[in-house]
Amino acid sequence: MVNYRMIELFIKTYIQMGILEMKKRIFALLLSASMLFALTGCGEDSELEIYRKEVESFYADVIEINDNINAIDAESENAPQKLLNELDSLNERFQEFGELEVPEEYIAVESLADEAASFMNEAVSLYHSSFSEGTFNDFSVGMAYEKYCRAILRINYIGDILQGKTLEGENINIHYEDEEE
C-alpha cells in the first residue's frame, strides 16, 4: 500500500521551495512593473497596461494556488487528489500565461513564457503519473520536480526582465538588437 500522505508531503515540500523563491520576487516585480508600465504606457488600454494587468493576475493566481497547496491537510484521505487538482490549476495558469500577447518592448519574455508553460505542463503530467494506478514512482517525481524548477526559473527570469535587470548565470546568452549576426 502506498503511503500517499508521505508522498504528498514530499511533493508539497519541493513545490514550496520553488514558489517561496518566486514569492520573494513578486512584490518587487509588481512594484517595478507597475512603475515601469506607468511610465511607458500612454493610455489605460495600452498594450503595456493590458500586459501588466495580466502579469499581476498571473502572479496573484500563482500565490493563491501556492496558499491552497499549503492548506492541504496531509492527513486527509484525498490529499493527493487535492494536490493534483491544485497542480492542474497551476498548469492551466502557466498555459494561459504562455499564450499572452507580449508587447514589443518585452519580446524576449515571450519565449521564456512559452518554455515555462511547456515545462510546467510536463511537470504536472509527471506528477500525475507518479500517482497512477496506486503506485508511487520516485523517478517520475524527481523528473517532475526538475521540470517544475525549470518553469519557475523562467518565470523568475521574466520577473527580472520586467524589472529591467540584466540576466546573469550559466547558459544565459544576451543578444542586443544592434548587434550584427
What are the residue ranges of the model-derived segments?
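Short, Lys/Arg-enriched N-terminal segments with co-localized hydrophobic residues
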Residues: 1-21
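Sec-dependent signal peptide recognition
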Residues: 24-32
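Bacterial signal peptide processing site
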Residues: 43-45
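C-terminal motif of bacterial Sec signal peptides marking the signal peptidase cleavage site
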Residues: 38-41
